[in-house]
């Protein structure tokens, strides 16, 4: 599948030049304090423009993403965030451009918030809370606020509590928006306990925090008015985000703008009272008592992106299909279909679109491929056929013909050829099984969609019978969406559906075996189940539809050998008789060539008496297949580290590992059953069963990467997914068609994944639904900053780092050491830590590596060295979480006088459930009169 966050079609770019007189999607706009200039982000760079409008000046030109500009009080410099070192760091640059100076070096993400004065910048980062903080320790969700000099150096913590969108008046009082919990930042219209409010922080000997707004929805982005007494902010109090004015302590607010559809964003104010804000992708200003004025901007800049980038790829296949002769495999790579030789790297590109193709299948004659493609926002079926009769293989074909197979207004995908090649079954609207006759193009329904439930595309399974008259499918029946069964369907769409398994457990992935006389399927009826979440271990079972086949399957090795000898003798006898009649021999040869398949007959009345469990151990299985003779089961299972290929000899009852760590995927045998093909995360493979030999299937695929085209496709894909699958049919009254047009027009002005993710989140935010939004994360710093697992004394201003507390289970607690709170770390690997100097570079890339700390103990006057292995910040955050839980437990115990227990639910997963189950029912908890269940979830 096309990876989230990439492009719009080149045709869409033809309508404008790179001297853009009306650019859109200008974000993070902020007016300078002197009111003369506006800085903003456009296409990943920082620009400035006169407040009256005109030609914008490009301040940064680095290929990295630059964002979030903040003006210095004297309007001479701009601080901004950039990922030019792999993660977002804070930089500062002159207002007219030049070489920026890097101010922060930690490998996390740092974003500037405001200047405290001309010499210091406040920024947000999730580095380390204070030892006294009660804020829930999450990975980057509840950041601290730090101050750093414009010359760089060691950051100083200002607040361990999250403070977003800070504005500071002349007296030093800070306005900020709070953060109470996790929700997508761009979600709109929600009224909930975690909606943001405006607060005021007054520093001093006795710092004061005062809540200024109480609306149950979102209040954001406060900025002081020039008088330092009143302030402006954004609120959804009357529908969409608009600008309001309020005085601290006054319950009434004055609404200044009255937009009804799109939100106002990025509010800022100059010392002359002029406001600046973003709306509908453009920038506006507003003078007190006046009317809003759009800032007309033109941008002239070089273009550093391309409509199409030619690439050659040798990895990345996500699915595959094996040709009938086993000489080729069709596969999907980044949404395009290819065919490659099994033995050679030669590769033929079948499709070349910025859209997504998937679920490819070969016709029985090997000359046609069928696949699904989401073109124009709608999944439909397409075929590609070898035109020249003298060409037998797709890999070397010189002429192909693509045709659209379905022409409906319903999503159609997951096509599968019938064994006789006359029809194709597919899914319509994700759960209805339909069949199209390739000769007449008539389409019929085999199973109504109400009998299946699809959570995500591709989660449904069905398979044709060998005689092309029946289909096995997953099935939920009535009210069984969480307990799938296997159903037998008549492919003509008539007759009664038969629930073959009728189980309260999950049964699925059924496959025809033994020529259609039986099926194998997976079931979790015997496996260990997750104690507190989804999932269970599976087994493979076989069900026989034929009594004779069942009896034969139960024969031991000796009985089977005797039967096969008898059948061989009978066949040889029949063959000698046929040789006497040459004409009959030719007729029989022709019949063999046709390989006519006899219609299947089913004895279903006794099917439950003919079920055999094939696997000896329940496990987490990826797939399974039965040999053609039915004497061996092959399956992919994980017991330790990675998926292994197992073989279970059913006649000898011997189980062994054929190959270790082959990966997870679908097992696809060739026609003779001698080889297994597998598409795993690490590539496509051919496995020769005899000898357990595995060979990579290599390819060289030409790929046309179209960044703009892919972004347009992904936009349409996401819009359609919501339209098809949102949990309420009316989309909560959202004008979804209208918003598609609103946001799609921004695509030509977006050239990077950060902006694209933000734009998608803005559109999805219109739904007012939780768990929505798009994400893009930078690659991260090449050398992540390591952690020592200690709290430092923020009040200490001398050389080195003074330890305030050593966190339990951190590196310094795992060995006998003289290091204790109060000690000062003077050097790291021999490099001295000077007062005010940035020490993070000394720990770059050192997690898990031995580091020598030079330590001074002021109490004893002793200096000594300590060797340890620092941990990652992720590992340190886990220790902080455990410390936080223990502190909460102690507080509850203290405040209740030991009468109330405390447990915390870490996440929505099985380990978290097991933890609370153990803690809640432990003897210490059972002695309590009540329990506090804390449900603040740790998102990782």
Label every PLM stretch briefly.
Residues 748-798, 862-866, 871-887:
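Extended, small/polar residue-biased N-terminal targeting/export presequences
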Residues 804, 831-938:
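Cleft-lining beta-strand/loop regions that shape enzyme active-site pockets
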Residues 30-35, 69-77, 113-120, 166-174, ...:
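Blade-terminus and WD-like Trp-Asp/Gly-His loop motifs, strongest in beta-propeller folds
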Residues 783-836, 910:
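PDZ/PDZ-like domain segments forming the peptide/carboxylate-binding groove
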Residues 20-26, 54-56, 301-317, 398-404, ...:
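A short helix->beta-strand "capping" segment at the edge of beta-propeller domains
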Residues 1-21:
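Bacterial Sec-dependent N-terminal signal peptides
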Residues 20-23, 41-47, 60-66, 79-91, ...:
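A flexible loop/linker signature enriched in serine peptidases of the S9 family
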Residues 21-47, 316-335, 615-631:
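Beta-strand-rich domains and repeat architectures in extracellular enzymes and scaffolds
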């Amino acid at each position: 599948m096309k990876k989230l966050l990439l492009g719009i079609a080149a045709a869409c770019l033809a309508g404008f030049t790179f001297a853009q007189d009306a650019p859109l999607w200008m974000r993070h706009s902020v007016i300078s304090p002197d009111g003369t200039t506006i800085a903003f982000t456009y296409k990943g760079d920082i620009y400035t423009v006169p407040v009256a409008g005109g030609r914008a000046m490009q301040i940064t030109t680095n290929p990295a993403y630059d964002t979030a500009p903040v003006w210095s009080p004297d309007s001479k410099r701009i601080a901004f965030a950039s990922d030019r070192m792999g993660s977002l760091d804070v930089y500062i640059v002159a207002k007219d451009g030049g070489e920026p100076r890097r101010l922060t070096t930690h490998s996390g993400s740092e974003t500037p918030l405001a200047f405290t004065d001309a010499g210091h910048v406040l920024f947000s980062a999730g580095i380390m809370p204070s030892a006294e903080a009660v804020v829930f320790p999450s990975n980057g969700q509840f950041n601290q606020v730090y101050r750093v000099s414009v010359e760089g150096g060691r950051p100083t913590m200002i607040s361990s509590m999250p403070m977003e969108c800070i504005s500071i008046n002349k007296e030093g009082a800070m306005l900020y928006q709070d953060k109470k919990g996790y929700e997508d930042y761009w979600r709109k219209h929600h009224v909930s306990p975690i909606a943001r409010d405006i607060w005021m922080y007054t520093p001093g000997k006795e710092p004061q925090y005062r809540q200024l707004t109480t609306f149950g929805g979102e209040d954001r982005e406060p900025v002081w008015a020039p008088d330092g007494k009143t302030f402006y902010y954004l609120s959804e109090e009357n529908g969409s985000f608009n600008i309001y004015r309020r005085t601290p302590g006054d319950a009434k607010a004055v609404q200044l703008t009255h937009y009804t559809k799109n939100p106002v964003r990025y509010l800022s104010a100059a010392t002359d009272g002029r406001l600046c804000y973003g709306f509908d992708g453009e920038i506006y200003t507003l003078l007190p008592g006046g009317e809003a004025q759009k800032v007309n901007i033109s941008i002239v800049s070089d273009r550093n992106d391309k409509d199409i980038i030619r690439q050659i790829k040798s990895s990345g296949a996500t699915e595959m299909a094996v040709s009938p002769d086993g000489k080729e495999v069709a596969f999907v790579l980044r949404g395009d279909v290819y065919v490659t030789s099994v033995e050679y790297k030669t590769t033929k590109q079948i499709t070349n679109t910025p859209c997504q193709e998937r679920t490819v299948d070969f016709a029985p004659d090997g000359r046609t491929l069928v696949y699904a493609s989401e073109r124009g926002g709608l999944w439909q079926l397409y075929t590609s056929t070898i035109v020249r009769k003298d060409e037998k293989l797709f890999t070397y074909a010189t002429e192909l013909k693509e045709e659209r197979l379905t022409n409906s207004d319903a999503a159609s995908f997951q096509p599968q050829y019938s064994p006789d090649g006359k029809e194709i079954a597919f899914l319509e609207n994700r759960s209805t099984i339909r069949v199209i006759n390739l000769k007449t193009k008539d389409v019929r329904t085999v199973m109504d969609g109400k009998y299946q439930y699809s959570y995500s595309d591709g989660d449904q399974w069905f398979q044709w019978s060998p005689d092309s008259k029946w289909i096995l499918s997953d099935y939920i029946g009535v009210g069984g969406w969480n307990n799938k069964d296997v159903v037998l369907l008549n492919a003509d769409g008539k007759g009664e559906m038969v629930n073959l398994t009728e189980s309260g457990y999950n049964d699925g992935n059924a496959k025809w075996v033994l020529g259609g006389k039986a099926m194998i399927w997976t079931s979790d009826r015997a496996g260990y189940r997750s104690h507190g979440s989804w999932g269970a271990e599976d087994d493979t079972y076989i069900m026989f539809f034929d009594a004779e086949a069942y009896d034969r399957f139960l024969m031991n090795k000796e009985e089977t050998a005797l039967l096969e000898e008898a059948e061989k003798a009978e066949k040889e006898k029949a063959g000698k008789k046929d040789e006497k009649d040459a004409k009959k021999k030719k007729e029989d040869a022709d019949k063999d060539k046709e390989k006519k398949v006899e219609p299947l007959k089913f004895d279903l009345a006794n099917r439950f008496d003919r079920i055999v469990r094939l696997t000896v151990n329940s496990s987490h299985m990826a797939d399974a297949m039965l040999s053609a003779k039915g004497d061996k089961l092959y399956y992919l299972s994980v017991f330790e580290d990675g998926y292994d290929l197992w073989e279970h000899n059913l006649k000898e009852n011997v189980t062994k590992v054929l190959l270790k760590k082959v990966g997870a995927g679908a097992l696809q045998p060739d026609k003779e059953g001698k080889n297994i093909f597998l598409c795993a995360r690490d590539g496509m493979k051919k496995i020769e069963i005899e000898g357990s030999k595995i060979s990579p299937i290599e390819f060289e695929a030409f790929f046309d990467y179209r960044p703009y085209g892919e972004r347009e496709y992904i936009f349409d894909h996401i819009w359609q997914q919501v339209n098809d699958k949102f949990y309420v049919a009316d989309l909560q009254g959202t004008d979804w068609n209208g918003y598609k047009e609103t946001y799609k027009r921004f695509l030509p002005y977006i050239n990077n994944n950060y902006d694209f993710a933000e734009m998608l989140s803005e559109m999805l935010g219109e739904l007012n639904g939780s768990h929505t939004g798009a994400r893009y994360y930078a690659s991260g710093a090449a050398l992540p900053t390591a952690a020592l697992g200690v709290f430092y004394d923020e009040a200490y201003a001398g050389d080195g780092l003074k330890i305030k507390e050593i966190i339990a289970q951190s590196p310094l607690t795992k060995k006998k050491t003289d290091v204790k709170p109060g000690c000062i770390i003077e050097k790291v690997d021999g490099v001295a830590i000077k007062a005010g100097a940035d020490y993070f570079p000394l720990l770059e890339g050192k997690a898990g590596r031995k580091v020598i700390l030079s330590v001074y103990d002021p109490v004893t006057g002793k200096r000594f060295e300590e060797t340890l292995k620092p941990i990652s910040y992720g590992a340190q955050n886990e220790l902080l979480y455990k410390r936080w839980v223990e502190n909460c437990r102690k507080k509850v115990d203290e405040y209740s006088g030991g009468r109330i227990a405390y447990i915390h639910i870490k996440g929505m997963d099985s380990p978290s459930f097991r933890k609370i189950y153990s803690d809640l029912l432990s003897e210490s908890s059972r002695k309590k009169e009540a329990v506090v269940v804390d449900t603040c979830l740790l998102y990782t």
